[in-house]
């Protein structure tokens, strides 16, 4: 009989890698297998230092701009990150005669296409998103300067003065859920009744699913841990959702060693989730840290099962990626399901 205090860890599902992030990491690993190191990657492939450092150890070299690639390595492939890039970047790659692989999330690519479609129909494009985010920079860069207006807040929406209020269409940053954009959209649609919406399939399923799972698990949680990087938009938002949905405390952490166990108040239930760019191996690490201090029971708090998969670039489909290749991020896949003891189901329902 363990002398450790009891603790329930409520493990959210879905959590962590979405299909777009998984695909982007696979593209880098497959390129390393097929073409050997170095493989250059423009910008962080996903917003997670653990993932970036793991890929660096395997031969990936990260740059912010293409002109940072040494001339003697310009015969090596370069990968564009999952966030997408402006058209000017692929044009620059062609000028340098670079062989590039585009790891842009297919859902982000759909947003790009929708923005272009709006323009072809004579509409000015409104982009709801966060200034400076790589995805926003990439989407705005699909069209010429002045063709896209960024709206970040309800106040922006209230004060926006378009050239022609009857010829507007909107798209959104994929890491914002329908709920995140609802207030801004309400204002825009009231002011501009003919505002054209994007096609339904351009909405990111993963952002909404992770927020719904956090909402469902938050009530009754003494502590809600979200695994993610400070520069991960969707991870920071999960912390806000946990706080608003009833968790006593919510914290963003990148690794288990960031948890200050000494300062934590008495714990009975800890809920655990991860942003779309956070690897499962960190979930394993955090659970192990709690097991060293508590007699842990795992509850699976699953709201939906995700089955989406995106194909990698055509050039890489002849290369085989093994589970061992992905072990540095995937850890013990489906951690709690592999446990033969101390595992229960927590019935969840997103409000």
Curated annotation (Swiss-Prot):
Source species: Bartonella tribocorum (strain CIP 105476 / IBS 506)
Residue stretches spanning the membrane: none
Function per UniProt: Catalyzes the conversion of 1-hydroxy-2-methyl-2-(E)-butenyl 4-diphosphate (HMBPP) into a mixture of isopentenyl diphosphate (IPP) and dimethylallyl diphosphate (DMAPP). Acts in the terminal step of the DOXP/MEP pathway for isoprenoid precursor biosynthesis.
Residues holding [4Fe-4S] cluster: 18, 105, 204
Cofactor note: Binds 1 [4Fe-4S] cluster per subunit.
InterPro entries documented for this protein: LytB/IspH
CDD domains from the UniProt entry: lytB_ispH
Pfam annotation, one family: LYTB
Pathway: Isoprenoid biosynthesis; dimethylallyl diphosphate biosynthesis; dimethylallyl diphosphate from (2E)-4-hydroxy-3-methylbutenyl diphosphate: step 1/1; Isoprenoid biosynthesis; isopentenyl diphosphate biosynthesis via DXP pathway; isopentenyl diphosphate from 1-deoxy-D-xylulose 5-phosphate: step 6/6
Family (UniProt): Belongs to the IspH family.
Biological processes annotated in GO: dimethylallyl diphosphate biosynthetic process; isopentenyl diphosphate biosynthetic process, methylerythritol 4-phosphate pathway; terpenoid biosynthetic process
Keywords: 4Fe-4S, Iron, Iron-sulfur, Isoprene biosynthesis, Metal-binding, Oxidoreductase
Catalytic activity: isopentenyl diphosphate + 2 oxidized [2Fe-2S]-[ferredoxin] + H2O = (2E)-4-hydroxy-3-methylbut-2-enyl diphosphate + 2 reduced [2Fe-2S]-[ferredoxin] + 2 H(+); dimethylallyl diphosphate + 2 oxidized [2Fe-2S]-[ferredoxin] + H2O = (2E)-4-hydroxy-3-methylbut-2-enyl diphosphate + 2 reduced [2Fe-2S]-[ferredoxin] + 2 H(+)
Binding-site list for dimethylallyl diphosphate: 47, 83, 133, 232-234, 277
PANTHER family membership: 4-HYDROXY-3-METHYLBUT-2-ENYL DIPHOSPHATE REDUCTASE
Binding residue positions for (2E)-4-hydroxy-3-methylbut-2-enyl diphosphate: 47, 83, 133, 174, 232-234, 277
Designated name of the protein: 4-hydroxy-3-methylbut-2-enyl diphosphate reductase
EC number assigned by the record: 1.17.7.4
Binding-site residues, isopentenyl diphosphate: 47, 83, 133, 232-234, 277
Domain of life (superkingdom): Bacteria
MF (Gene Ontology): 4 iron, 4 sulfur cluster binding; 4-hydroxy-3-methylbut-2-enyl diphosphate reductase activity; metal ion binding
Listed Gene3D superfamilies: 3.40.50.11270, 4-hydroxy-3-methylbut-2-enyl diphosphate reductase, catalytic domain
Active site, UniProt feature: 135 (proton donor)
EC primary class: oxidoreductase
